Regions:
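Juxtamembrane regions of bacterial inner-membrane/periplasmic proteins
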Residues: 2-295, 312-314, 368, 404
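Soluble, non-transmembrane domains of envelope/secretory-pathway proteins that act on or interact
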Residues: 1-5, 485-491, 529-788
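A penicillin-recognizing enzyme superfamily signal
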Residues: 272-293, 305-307, 316, 324-337, ...
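Conserved catalytic neighborhood of penicillin-recognizing serine enzymes
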Residues: 101-125, 179, 242-258, 359-414, ...
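Acidic/histidine-enriched alpha-helical segments
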Residues: 88-94, 136, 167, 206-208, ...
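Glycine-rich, acidic and aromatic/proline-enriched surface loops and short helix-turn segments
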Residues: 115-122, 155-162, 179, 183-195, ...
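Residue-level preference for non-acidic, small/hydrophobic
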Residues: 44, 73, 116, 149, ...
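Short pre-catalytic segments that frame enzyme active sites
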Residues: 38, 45-59, 168, 197-201, ...
Length: 788
């Protein structure tokens, strides 16, 4: 009895050990082979793919297997697939009998389950390994459904050369997804894993045709297809050389590779938000412009299109992809590259100053020769307007007014604002950039720049959705993974920019003159309204254009990846036409809704753009952000006293008060006036004082160059002698005569046109100017000696 009990215990232990061995004999995961990175459009169509790390074209596991492939592979490899548990014993007996009769391996008995095990283990084919495969195949069937087994087989079966898996084979041999293959094409692929090294497209074509046709005949016998379908399928040609896979978004594919961990994606396949048709059209358009630009030595360009309503990227062309021409550097993703932004940050400064109550939309900004601590900005046309409305300065992209605005706003404050806009490339202190920050003195990426304008547009679009409040998640990044988790809404009473500010800024951006025939856009009712801004970096290295409607943000860049500048490489000439052609690919939309509760109507001085003072001559009522009510009153309108004929200014010391006429007069500072009157014929110069009248303390002269306490450098000429600097002063009287003295030494006299070339010695000097009426202007300047 005890002996029998021991036997039972030993048997139970042995059974338990075998059961444990059986259960843990199947490795997890089954396959650890690297897979290709695969990028799909939003509709599931393949956009781009890259080869796996081991040099194989092997797509990640698919969700399902096409029905045609199921029928073909089961008929060809394992006709009792749905009726066995991993091992087909009928096939085993048949194989043993046939092999004994042939005295060699003439037939196999591997089921699809056994083949999956063999593919995962990669062991040599021996009797022992065959038995191990049978054991593990049974275990495999316990844990996996038949559909899962077919899916694993289809993803890992060899299809000749370096092609693994049905999906990769379908694209490599037929150039389209497996779901779209015919019966003949699917039958061809189904016979390849049986002997991929012997029978593959491009080699042994006759044997491949025989195997395919035999399979088609079996499908007829099984009544899966009819004879007519089989005959038509047999007439189809077999593929020859492998085809290249689609590369419609290679730069986005590489971006996905780099960001895979951050995206928390556990597969090398993603379905993106890209619109397949738009992406292909944008690739075509990019190629056209590349051909045009290449003649001027401009090799690279990029375009990004974002759907504002949901923040999804719908088209991503990081460069004109020309891998066969390595000198073009088309592999560089210019959407991620750091480049000088040129003037593309100016709307953000304009908006920030509106939002914080520094200006109104049309506040006059100084546009005169400027030197700030050795920094001398220049307008692109090298001219000066004297003074120009802020919105007009933005639409014309004038540099000097932008620097003046940043000087008023403080570059440290603007730097902090840009950080809140999530510009990731501002990795140096604000002092490193200084005032050049507004003229391209930093580096940005197309991605960050587009996201800044995306955030503004989304905020304005959501004006009604949040009852005038703000979802600060609107300033989050755009996304390109279709099922990417969206950030939670964060509803706040305030935001980076209020609705009224954004609406006013977009209106100013809409007034930019469009290039070429686009300048006539307002004459066509079908032309949509677009807020846009161009940018050109120093040395003509980068050309930008970013635009937006309520539905889309479009950002384009043109230039050379290596930073080489080219003549004509400007935002308006190179990037803007490209951007407007991109907008033509998109559906038109209405303009942004006016956020009336976030705007107020106030009286504004027509001439200065400031909040109207009581003495402003002409007042306009304008919609401005509410903070505009707290801005300064017009500083340029002054009440002056004239004689009865309104010819001269007078005072009560020289003229009867009862005969005086009191007028409000628009008076700019002398330097601003000097340039402003040349561009504005309606500007009236302040009348002179009547002879014998004591003048009020109003400046009649102002130095244009050099400014008070300026340090200047006078370079040497070619012959080694010291050159000359052109000194320039503005006077209110067009007919004034000015006598010039340096350190009390007379150096010359000017009349009407007050410029004089001088060459003072290095050191500190006192400049004294005296006009014909005895009015004096005295200021100090220093000449630097860089020879020391």
């Amino acid at each position: 009895m005890k002996k029998q009990l021991k036997v039972i215990i030993y048997v139970d232990i042995l059974f338990a050990v075998l059961l444990l061995f059986f259960w843990f004999s199947l490795p997890k995961p089954l396959f650890i082979t690297p897979t290709s990175y695969v990028l799909e459009a939003s509709n599931g169509e393949l956009l781009s793919a890259s080869i796996a790390k081991d040099g194989q074209w092997r797509f990640p596991l698919a969700d399902s297997v096409p029905e045609k492939f199921k029928h073909c592979i089961i008929t060809f490899e394992d006709k009792r697939f749905y009726n066995h548990l991993g091992v087909d014993f009928i096939a085993v007996v048949r194989a043993i009998r046939q092999n004994m009769q042939a005295k060699s391996v003439a037939s196999g008995a591997s089921t699809l389950s056994m083949q999956v095990i063999r593919l995962s283990r990669k062991k040599q084919r021996t009797i022992f390994q065959k038995l191990a495969e049978m054991w593990m195949a049974v275990r495999f069937e316990v844990s996996y459904s038949k559909e899962e087994i077919l899916t694993l087989y289809a993803a890992n079966a060899p299809f000749g050369s370096n092609v693994v898996g049905l999906e990769a084979a379908s694209w490599r041999y037929y150039g389209r997804p497996a779901e779209n293959l015919s019966w003949g094409e699917m039958a061809t692929l189904a016979v390849l894993p049986n002997s991929p090294s012997l029978v593959r497209p491009g080699k042994n074509a006759s044997r491949l045709i025989i195997k395919r046709n035999n399979l088609l005949d079996k499908l007829v016998e099984e009544k899966i297809i009819d004879r007519a379908t089989a005959q038509l399928s047999k007439a189809e040609p077999i593929p020859s050389a492998p085809l290249p896979l689609p590369q419609n978004a290679p730069h986005l594919l590489n971006r996905f590779k780099d960001e895979m961990k951050a995206l928390k994606v556990n597969t090398t396949r993603i379905t993106s938000t890209i619109d397949e048709n738009l992406q292909k059209e944008l690739n075509r358009l990019t190629a056209q412009y590349h051909q045009k630009f290449a003649a001027n030595g401009i090799n690279n360009l990029a375009a990004l299109v974002i759907n504002i309503k949901n923040g999804s990227v719908v088209a991503y062309v990081g460069n004109c992809y020309l891998p066969q021409q390595k000198e073009m550097e088309s592999h560089v993703d210019m959407i991620s590259a750091r480049r000088s932004p040129g003037s593309t940050l100016k709307p953000l400064l304009y908006a920030s100053m509106l939002n914080d109550g520094f200006i109104l939309p049309q506040t006059l900004i100084s546009d005169v020769p400027t030197q700030i601590g050795g920094y001398s900005p220049q307008n692109f046309d090298l001219g000066y307007d004297g003074a120009i409305p802020a919105d007009r300065a933005l639409s014309r992209s004038l540099n000097i007014p932008a620097v003046k605005m940043l000087q008023q706003y403080k570059y440290e404050r603007f730097y902090d604002k840009l950080k809140k806009f999530n510009f990731s490339t501002l990795n140096k202190p604000a002092d490193h950039y200084g005032l050049s920050l507004i003229l391209g003195g930093s580096e940005v990426t197309m991605w960050d720049l587009s996201n800044a304008y995306l955030g503004m547009a989304r905020t304005l679009n959501h004006y009604n959705d949040y009852q005038g409040k703000y979802n600060n998640a609107d300033y989050g990044s755009a996304y390109y993974v279709k099922d990417q988790e969206k950030p939670e809404e964060v509803i706040e009473p305030t935001s980076l920019l209020d609705h009224g500010t954004i609406w006013s800024t977009f209106n100013a951006m809409e007034e930019v003159m469009r290039p070429g025939d686009e300048g006539l856009w307002q004459q066509f009712s079908s032309s949509q309204r677009i807020a846009w801004k161009t940018g050109t970096s120093f040395g003509f290295r980068d050309a930008w254009s970013v635009g937006l409607t309520p539905n889309y943000v479009v950002c384009v860049w043109v230039g050379n990846a290596d930073g080489e500048g080219r003549p004509g490489l400007t935002g308006i000439e190179a990037a803007a036409p490209f951007m407007f052609d991109v907008f033509r690919l998109l559906p038109s939309s209405k303009w942004f809704e006016m956020p009336k509760t976030k705007l107020k109507r106030i009286a504004v001085c027509k001439q200065s753009g400031y909040k109207a003072s009581p003495i402003c001559e002409t007042k306009l009522v304008q919609w401005v952000p509410p903070v505009g009510e707290k801005t300064a009153l017009c500083p340029y309108h002054k009440l002056i006293h004239l004689d009865a004929a309104e010819t001269y200014q007078v005072t009560n010391q020289c003229y009867s008060v009862t005969q005086m006429k009191h007028k409000s007069w628009f008076v700019l500072p002398p330097t601003m006036e000097y340039y402003y009157k040349t561009k504005n014929a309606e500007y009236r110069i302040l009348p002179l004082f009547m002879e014998g009248c004591q003048q009020e303390q109003t400046a009649v002269m102002e130095m244009i160059y050099p400014k008070a306490n300026a340090s200047i450098y006078i370079p040497l000429e070619i012959d080694g002698n010291r050159g000359k600097a052109v000194f320039n002063v503005a006077h209110r009287n067009n007919n004034a005569t000015i006598h010039w003295h340096i350190d009390e030494e007379y150096v010359g006299t000017t009349k009407n046109f007050h410029q004089i070339a001088l060459s003072p010695k290095p050191g500190k000097h006192t400049l004294t100017l005296t006009d014909q009426n005895g009015e004096r202007l005295v200021q100090v300047f220093t000449v630097l000696d860089k020879e020391k």
